[in-house]
Structures are given as structure tokens and as C-alpha cells.
Regions:
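Generic structural detector for well-ordered beta-strands
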Residues: 27, 116, 151-153, 180, ...
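Beta-propeller blade termini and top-face loops
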Residues: 1-138, 145-148
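Short coil-to-beta strand junction motifs in C2/discoidin
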Residues: 159-164, 217-221
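Short, glycine-anchored, charge-dense loop/turn motifs used at functional sites
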Residues: 170-174, 222
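Glycine-centered tight-turn motifs at strand-turn-strand junctions
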Residues: 175-218
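Contiguous beta-strand segments within globular domains
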Residues: 124-163, 169, 189-191
Length: 222
């Protein structure tokens, strides 16, 4: 239920006609109030219109699992979900969902829309000693990929794109990387490894990384 008058009256926002299973948890986005997440006995739901309508979320999430608790990690804009029997799930970077909610559940205008990218950090990971061949003795979830995550929306229904070019610039305007990918309709995500474009002067070894002040400046369809 939802109250807009400090508890004097309540409006039911979820029932059997809208969601499947008992409601167990609910979380409203502190940045975009129209974006609301609902956890039920049988899955996760998302609303882009302040709980008026619900959409079942099944992208990388179990179709039927008790969704007991949720919180939003505001620095990373991640939705962290606690389930019963299926461990913890993290929905990385909900900024694209905020854009939909801000627009009343509709996609932003334009064939291609680039969403604000989260901060990315360069890190060198070393495997700890004694954990090389663990077989089935170790249970661990899969971490998200390293690098910069760039999200964009394709909503052209008539024309299918052969490829998409992403150009990355420094704060001073220097182009340092060009990425190409095969996009599909809807929200897409490409990972940049925080490296510069190759140089003919480099003769070997590992390529150097890139420091701060990086901006996604240009998307071009081909």
C-alpha cells in the first residue's frame, strides 16, 4: 500500500492482477522517485511510473525466487538484492532505468541515446596463493567485468544496424580509443578496458592504461 497523506489513507499498489506472489520487499529509487522495485515470493518487479504498473525483471535474474531485501548502493547506482536460497544479486548501474522512469516509462527520444557512464577504476587482480585448482570445493559468484561500462539505447525498429562505433575522448578533446560493436534494439552495454588505441611505435609489452578525465563524446551508427 502507498500513502500520500502521512497514513490517513492508503492506496493498494500491488495485487494478484499485477504481480505474482506475496510482496516481500519494496525499494523506491532516491534519485528518480518514479523508479520503484518490488520483490515478491516469485521474483523481481520494476515500475517506471511510481508503482502504477509493474514489469517482471528476468534479465540475468531467476524467474521465480523469493526476493527478500533490496538496497541501492548510491555511489555505484547499483541495486543490491538479497534472495532466499539464491544468494545475493547485484543489478549493475540502474542509470538507464532512471532515464526511462524520468520519461514516464517511455524511451528517450532519438535513435541512439548514450547514458551517463559510472566511474571506472583501473585495478590489477592477482589470484591468491593456494587457490589454483579448487574444482567444486569453492562456491563463489561471478564478479562483474573490469573496465568502463558504457550503456546506450537503440530504438530504431525499421533499420537494423550493422555496427556501432563508440569514440572516447579525454577532457582536453583528444580521441584515445575507438570501439566497434554489434548492437541490438533496446539497452546495450559495451566494456572499455581503459586502454588507449594501439600505436605503431609500441614494440612489445603491455599497453599503458588511461588516467582520469575521460568522456564518451560520440556514438555513430554504421
Amino acid at each position: 500500500y502507498h500513502s500520500a497523506d502521512y497514513g490517513k489513507t492508503f492506496t493498494r499498489i500491488a495485487d494478484d492482477s499485477k504481480v505474482w506472489g506475496f510482496a516481500l520487499s519494496i525499494k523506491q529509487d532516491p534519485t528518480e522517485p518514479n523508479l520503484v522495485f518490488l520483490g515478491t515470493e516469485f521474483g523481481l518487479y520494476v515500475s517506471f511510473d511510481k508503482a502504477k504498473t509493474w514489469n517482471k525483471w528476468e534479465h540475468g535474474y531467476p524467474k521465480a525466487v523469493s526476493t527478500y531485501d533490496m538496497t541501492i548502493q548510491e555511489r555505484e547506482a547499483d541495486l543490491v538484492i538479497g534472495t532466499f536460497g539464491r544468494a545475493i544479486y547485484v543489478l549493475d548501474d540502474i542509470r538507464p532505468l532512471r532515464a526511462f522512469a524520468k520519461n514516464g516509462g517511455k524511451a528517450p527520444v532519438g535513435k541512439i541515446t548514450a547514458f551517463p557512464a559510472p566511474d571506472a577504476y583501473q585495478a590489477e587482480i592477482q589470484q591468491p596463493h593456494g587457490e589454483r585448482f579448487m574444482a567444486s570445493a569453492k562456491y563463489a559468484g561471478e564478479n562483474r567485468v573490469f573496465g568502463g561500462r558504457l550503456s546506450y539505447l537503440i530504438q530504431d525498429e525499421k533499420e537494423k544496424l550493422d555496427s556501432l562505433t563508440v569514440k572516447i575522448y579525454t577532457a582536453s578533446g583528444e580521441q584515445i580509443r575507438t570501439l566497434k560493436t554489434l548492437p541490438s534494439k533496446g539497452v546495450n552495454r559495451i566494456i572499455w578496458n581503459l586502454d588507449r588505441k594501439s600505436s605503431a611505435e609500441m614494440t612489445g609489452g603491455w599497453g599503458g592504461g588511461q588516467g582520469g578525465g575521460i568522456h564518451l563524446r560520440h556514438l555513430r551508427q554504421v
